[in-house]
Amino acid sequence: MPKMKLVVVGNGMAGARAVEEVLARGGADQFDIAMFGDEPYGNYNRIMLSNILSGAQDASEIFINPLSWYGENGIKLHAGARVTEIDRAARVVISENGTREDYDKLLIATGSRSFIPHMAGLNTAEGKIKPGIFGFRTIDDCNGIIAMAKRSQRAAVIGGGLLGLEAARGLINHDCEVHVVHLAGHLMEMQLDGTGGAILKSSMETMGIHVHLRKLTVGILGDDNVTGLTFKDGSTLDCDMVVVAAGIKPNAEIGLRCGLTVERAIVVDNHMRSVDDRNVYAVGECAQHRGRVYGLVAPLWEQAKVFAEHITSRNPDAAYHGSKLATKLKVMGVELASMGITEPAEDRDEIIQFTEPKKGTYKKLIVRDGRLVGGILMGDISKAAYLMQCFDRDAPLPDERLSLMFDIGTPSQKITIDEMPAGMQVCNCNGVTKSAIAACVSSGKRSTKAVMDATRAGKGCGSCKTLVGELVEWLCGGEVEEDPSVHYYVPTIPLRKPDLAKAIREQNLKSVSAVFKALAGGVEDAPSKPALASLLITLWHKD
């Protein structure tokens, strides 16, 4: 039986993950696969762009699928070829450089781009964006920001959401003053309430970042180059560089041009298939499902799996029913878990709250009819796995509500390893589930380091390393192959985290390169740089 032709428009995290899922289900025997990507690179982890900006990682270190991966898996990649036309009648995709690919099945995974709102002075007389103004979405964006930061005195980041704070985190490692201006009354209003936002603001200010709230940017000052911002309230802020992180806009225009239904994004059904064409699918930030467009990684992974199950006929009934939004991440060196709503929405909603601002600790849970409908954990996220499972499964909660936050003598409300569902995400940065780690151990990897190297779990912000180690030990029945370096915070430095922190303080080491030079004989471990950079921010944020 001849193979069908699958063409994927988009080589970002959504498109490449969807292809990985297809291959994992034997899709190489069913399809010849061709991919188009706007950028001249393989697929990389956009979550780690702030590490590129800060200098903690080189761009080459964040690639999930390097260019060699495509050929090795029989995939024809058209890198740096933006698709400008889809002819659904002829079933052909055409790029701006004239490359054509016929298809039997088409996946659109064009993602999103930085939303740059209209502001006076944004463009030059020629209609181009003024020099010194950047989005924060791609490797090329990072390279431009880094080059500008070398000669910048004061940088302004427009947007105090997750993306804006990641940009600010990256900029503080350069010798320029960093200001964050935000329209809302507190930072990260999609994940935090006012109290949590205030604690985060305080943490940022101790790191030397200036935060300006309730500021609507209406103009950019300067004729040929940026000299400042002007706000709706009449105030101004001097700066010579602007990073716009005010949200994202789905890249759905290609769907509109080929006649697909597009609202905020390309409208899809429960199979991630266009509502207009049974041969066209869409996943990721360019897809709209039941009125929602998802910007977090976990929904993207779920959509990719449903697409792969359906298109390979592994499970023709596979369906995506939407995602309950829950995330665990590290922002400005502060560990954070957020799920569901941040404020009570009904009179019967019950709030359990604990605040310890000096330690940067904040916990808030919203319970409705004995079920968790929202939660914020900041600083101490030891209960996050249990609470996120309760939230995801809509499980009944114990009557002793304080046990949800603290160990108070009642049975500990923490999820055990064996209670973790197979599909539970262990590493949010790289989308690694419990089942993926179990499969890795079954394949013969018997040490935590080997599993981390093979699956990329724990290779992002580093906050899941302990859980990964516990899971590997459980899967190995306690017979883990001992690798001394697994206990080291950095493999090339033979010190556990507390001892490493002590050595850093005693030797006054304030950069990643200084730590490697002093404690590892100059031998650098690239995958450990993000976690080490985060540790340095935590240790020195008051200096």
Segments predicted by a language model, with ranges:
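A Rossmann-like FAD-binding core segment of flavoenzymes
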Residues: 28-32, 76-94, 101, 172-270
